[in-house]
C-alpha cells in the first residue's frame, strides 16, 4: 500500500480508503453488513494496508459509527484514521440537523460516544443545508479542533461558491482550515473538474472521492445486486446513453489490459491530479481485493483519452 499526505496537512493516509456506509443495520438498508460481516471486510482492508475508514452519523442511524468503533478497538488507535460526518437529520427537532453551533457540538459528542474514541481524525460536513451561516459553521468547527475532539476538517458535497466562501472566511480569521473534500467523482460524473478540483489543487486540499466505479455502473454490476435492486437513487445518477458509451470504453480497455472494468475505472480516478484516496464501499472481500489490485495498473495517455472521450456534461446538482 502507498501512503500519501492528505492535502497540505502532514497526515498520511492510504492511497485507498474504506467506506463504512455498508456497515450497519439491515433495517436501514437491506444490503448493509452486520458487525461480523463488517469485521471481515475491515480485517482484509487492514491486511491490504488501508488506514483510512470513512463513516457518518446518519448511516444506519448511528449504527455504522458503533460498528466502526467496535472494529477499531482491535488495532492501536494511532494506526487508524477515522473520518465521520455531520449535518444530516438525527432527530425530529429543528436543530437536530445542519451546521449550527448547537448541532455541531451535539453531533460531535454523539459521534465520539458511538465510536468509543476520544477524538475524530477527520470531521466532515455532509448533506449541504443552503440556509447555513458559513461564518458560524467555520467558527464552531474551529472550536472543535481547539478542544481536541477533532483533529482535521473536511467537507462533502457543498456548492463550490459556498465552499470557497467558507474556506476564505477561515483563512482571513486564522481558523482551522479544510484539509479534504469528499466529492462525487468518476468517469461518469466529472463536473468538479471545472472548479472544485483545480481550486483544491491550488490550495493544497486533499480529494477523497466516493463512488469511483459509479455504484457498479462502470463494471457491469449496476443490476442484479441487492443494493442496485433496492436503490432507486442510483438510476437518477447514471444510465444515460452517453454513460453506456463510457462503460463500453472501460470494458474495451479492460479487455486489452487483462484487467477488470472496476480496476480500469479505479485506475483512472487514481491517476487524476490531486486525487488522494478514493473511497471503496466494498461489502464483499473479493471486490476489495479487486480494487486494491488497481493500484498496480497504470493507464497510458492513449487509454485515458479513450476513456474520457465520450463524456457528456451533466446538469448542476446544486
Residues covered by each model-derived region:
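Active-site groove signature of glycoside hydrolases
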Residues: 112-131
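Short, acidic/polar
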Residues: 32-45, 99-115, 163-167
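Beta/alpha (TIM)-barrel catalytic core signal, keyed to glycine-rich beta->alpha loops juxtaposed to Asp/Glu
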Residues: 3, 130-314, 318
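Acidic (Asp/Glu)-rich catalytic clusters
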Residues: 71-79, 113-116, 145, 167-174
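Active-site mouth loops of central-metabolism enzymes
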Residues: 23-36, 90-102, 126-132
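Conserved beta-strand positions
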Residues: 18, 55, 84, 122-125, ...
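A short, structured active-site edge motif that brings together acidic residues
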Residues: 78-91, 181-184
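N-terminal binding-site loop/beta-alpha segment at the start of enzyme catalytic domains
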Residues: 1-80, 316
Amino acid at each position: 500500500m502507498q501512503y500519501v499526505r492528505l492535502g497540505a496537512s502532514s497526515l498520511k493516509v492510504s492511497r485507498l480508503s474504506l467506506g463504512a456506509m455498508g456497515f450497519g443495520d439491515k433495517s436501514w438498508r437491506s444490503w448493509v453488513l452486520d458487525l461480523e460481516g463488517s469485521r471481515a471486510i475491515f480485517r482484509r482492508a487492514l491486511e491490504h494496508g488501508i488506514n483510512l475508514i470513512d463513516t457518518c452519523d446518519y448511516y444506519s442511524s448511528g449504527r455504522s459509527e458503533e460498528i466502526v468503533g467496535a472494529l477499531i478497538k482491535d488495532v492501536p488507535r494511532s494506526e487508524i484514521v477515522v473520518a465521520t460526518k455531520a449535518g444530516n437529520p438525527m432527530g425530529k427537532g429543528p436543530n437536530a440537523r445542519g451546521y449550527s453551533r448547537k448541532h455541531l457540538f451535539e453531533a460531535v459528542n454523539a459521534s465520539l460516544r458511538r465510536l468509543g474514541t476520544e477524538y475524530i481524525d477527520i470531521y466532515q460536513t455532509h448533506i449541504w443545508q443552503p440556509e447555513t451561516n458559513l461564518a458560524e459553521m467555520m467558527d464552531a468547527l474551529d472550536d472543535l479542533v481547539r478542544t481536541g475532539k477533532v483533529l482535521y476538517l473536511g467537507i462533502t458535497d457543498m456548492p463550490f461558491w459556498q465552499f470557497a466562501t467558507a474556506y476564505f472566511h477561515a483563512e482571513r480569521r486564522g481558523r482551522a482550515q479544510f484539509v479534504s473534500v469528499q466529492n462525487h467523482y468518476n468517469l461518469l460524473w466529472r463536473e468538479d473538474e471545472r472548479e472544485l478540483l483545480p481550486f483544491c489543487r491550488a490550495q493544497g486540499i486533499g480529494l477523497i472521492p466516493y463512488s469511483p466505479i459509479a455504484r457498479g455502473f462502470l463494471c457491469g454490476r449496476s443490476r442484479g445486486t441487492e443494493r442496485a435492486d433496492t436503490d432507486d437513487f442510483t438510476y437518477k445518477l447514471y444510465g444515460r446513453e452517453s454513460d453506456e458509451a463510457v462503460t463500453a470504453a472501460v470494458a474495451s480497455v479492460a479487455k486489452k489490459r487483462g484487467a477488470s472494468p472496476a480496476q480500469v475505472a479505479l485506475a483512472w480516478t487514481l491517476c487524476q491530479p490531486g486525487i488522494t484516496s478514493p473511497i471503496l464501499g466494498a461489502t464483499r472481500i473479493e471486490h476489495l481485493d479487486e480494487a486494491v489490485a488497481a493500484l498496480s495498473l497504470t493507464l497510458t495517455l492513449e487509454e485515458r483519452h479513450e476513456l474520457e472521450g465520450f463524456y457528456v456534461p451533466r446538469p448542476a446538482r446544486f
